[in-house]
Amino acid sequence: MSNRIGPQRSTKTAAKLRLLPSTEEFDDFRRQDTGREVYSQIPQIEGSTAKRDAEHLGKRHREFLPRVTAYCTCDTFRVDLLFKFFQSRRSSHKTRPKQFDECIYSPYSYNNEETTDLLPDTLESSRGTLNRESSQESLQSIFEESGLDRNQPLFREVFCFTYGVVVLWGYTIDEEHRFLRELGRFEIEKLKIEDMEVEEFNYYITTLYQPRIFNDFIALRDASNYMIRLSISHAIAQSVKISLFEELVNETIDATKDTPQMIAETGRVNLKREEIMMAVGQLFILRININLQGSVLDSPELMWTEPQLEPIYTAARSYLEINQRVALLNQRVEVIGDLLSMLKEQITHTHDESLEWIVVILMGLLVLIALFSIVVDWKLFQ
């Protein structure tokens, strides 16, 4: 839905792994997570099954695994009305809404399916018999080697965050777009389709090894605990919101990158005062938006009330490189701040120049008036 660059994180293109602590490992995780390198490469994964799975699952398998997708669609939601909307769909869509500070959670079903078969008989029917059979054999070999259950549970869950992001688990692309249309009435300052930011993942359930995120595949052990998915969704939602900020900063820098060069070459900005004021206003609005919504980039309140979830959230946040991206974002905002100060100085300088010319002109007029008076007096005296 977007033509933008997308999340500026290395895990989008590089095969990196982040292990997720399971429930019984929370205490061990706190002792072990002491600031060392947050990623482990494939050869460091304990257990041959997990290693083989990490090597085999790739982009060509995404269409067969359940989806996890985050959309940044607006500035914020009408939270009260949205919660009432979910409450009104208990019978038709089997909703059970719950509110956690800045997030509304609810199941939201469009049909009665509770599992999905990753090897349906009609697999890839549109690609021809040979491709279909080779795809089935490839997937079947992965399931046999990794021990993945071909019948994966479909959660069909919605996590709506107050800062304009929704994370959807277990939906098809068509169902995601259908839900986004239903969500539209609750959006404030809705983004254009081309301005929306999207993060896409896939998930599967396995009990053979530790939960983890690798190559945007989320491996979970417990299918029944939605609080784990809430923790991961918090990190994903923050990541997609950061993507929006990154794109806004990039666009602003690209639009104003010629201004410093212009000043370096000519000593002034060859723009009209109105154009300079418009540029200053745009830069100022961007800084305000990032500063006002910067709280969404911090650890959510849920991690204080449910501290057992913090290790999972921290691990997902590390995989998404949120800390590094926020630091880089702040640096680029500082650059914008410097440019803002420079433009303000240019406006002040231009204004001072105008005042100086006004004073010069007035003094010239006074001199002319004085000379005229002298000439008139001299003629009268004659």
Swiss-Prot record:
The modification Phosphoserine is found at S135. It is found in: Nucleus membrane. The chain crosses the membrane at residues 356-376. Pfam families: DUF155. Coiled coil: none annotated. Keywords: Meiosis, Membrane, Nucleus, Phosphoprotein, Sporulation, Transmembrane, Transmembrane helix. Interacts with sad1. Belongs to the RMD1/sif2 family. This is Sad1-interacting factor 2. It comes from Schizosaccharomyces pombe (strain 972 / ATCC 24843) (Fission yeast). The gene is sif2.
